[in-house]
Design a protein with these regions (language model features):
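Solvent-exposed interaction patches of small proteins and small membrane subunits
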Residues: 1-112
Length: 112
């Protein structure tokens, strides 16, 4: 029997919410504390993504699932300053909203 996937989906939503709260505190490209906090939550999000069922992920084909999972490796293995803050901000600004919409849809569908 496989583990329930819903807690991982909730971890993703929680990480997205935290990232938005971090952004509300200032520009993460200019503040290393905010930047580090955002990176940590992106790592959490990217670690939870592969634990979602593939059949659920196929319902959101526009989400780059493999890239999200791969982003975790970049975050973990390039932690010594090789990650461009502007790229991170762009990922947050352009990709978290569709991901959140997809995860919410997965959870809503599961409750029906």
């Amino acid at each position: 029997m496989s583990k329930p996937w819903q807690p991982y989906a909730q971890h993703i939503l929680d990480a997205i919410a935290k990232i938005h709260r971090i952004q509300a505190r200032g520009d993460l490209t200019q503040d290393e504390v905010l930047y580090d906090a955002a990176l940590r939550n992106l790592q959490t999000l990217s670690e939870a993504t592969p634990l979602l069922p593939d059949e659920k992920k196929t319902d959101c084909p526009a989400i780059p699932w493999a890239e999200i999972s791969g982003f975790r490796n970049i975050l973990v293995h390039h932690y010594l300053g090789n990650i461009d803050p502007i790229t991170v901000a762009s990922v947050i600004d352009n990709h978290l909203k569709p991901l959140k919409k997809c995860i919410v849809s997965m959870l809503d569908e599961d409750e029906r």
